[in-house]
Swiss-Prot record:
It comes from Escherichia coli O157:H7. It is found in: Cytoplasm. Belongs to the SufE family. This is Cysteine desulfuration protein SufE. Its main location: cytoplasm. The keyword Transferase does not apply.
């Protein structure tokens, strides 16, 4: 996650964008910073149902009990949304993930009101899947 900003810097950078075109470009840029997902991780068990695009999210727990997320999508904007979600959950334990509400962050960014309904549903599906995977680990 060293290539991605922390939550506060994400919000600052997002709010600095002059308009929604710049914000979409920033989201896409964040997606381009995600590490490449291995082919073997593009499996049905890592596939997120409820997304219009193909989305894969892998969750592992490191030796310190912190979750590590990896993901990819076949759509640039969705890959960027994956990066945004990963930033919000960075350095958390599985229990932290289960308890953390991302909605206030999305509201500060005015994110969901500028996404199409299908993208918003896909974003919710990603969050549900991450929380379910975290609950299984906690």
């Amino acid at each position: 996650m060293a290539l991605l900003p922390d939550k506060e810097k994400l919000l600052r950078n997002f709010l600095r964008c002059a308009n929604w075109e710049e914000k979409y470009l920033y989201i896409i840029e964040l997606g381009q910073r995600l590490p490449e997902l291995r082919d073997e991780d593009r499996s049905p068990q890592n596939s997120i149902q409820g997304c219009q695009s193909q989305v894969w999210i892998v969750m592992r727990q490191n030796a310190q009990g912190i979750i590590e997320l990896q993901g990819d999508s076949d759509a640039a904007i969705v890959k960027g949304l994956i990066a945004v979600v990963f930033i919000l959950y960075d350095q958390m334990t599985p229990q932290d993930v289960v308890n953390f509400d991302v909605r206030p962050w999305f509201e500060k960014m005015a994110l969901t009101q500028h996404l199409t309904p299908s993208r918003s549903q896909g974003l919710e599906a990603m969050i549900r899947a991450i929380r379910a995977k975290a609950a299984a680990l906690s």
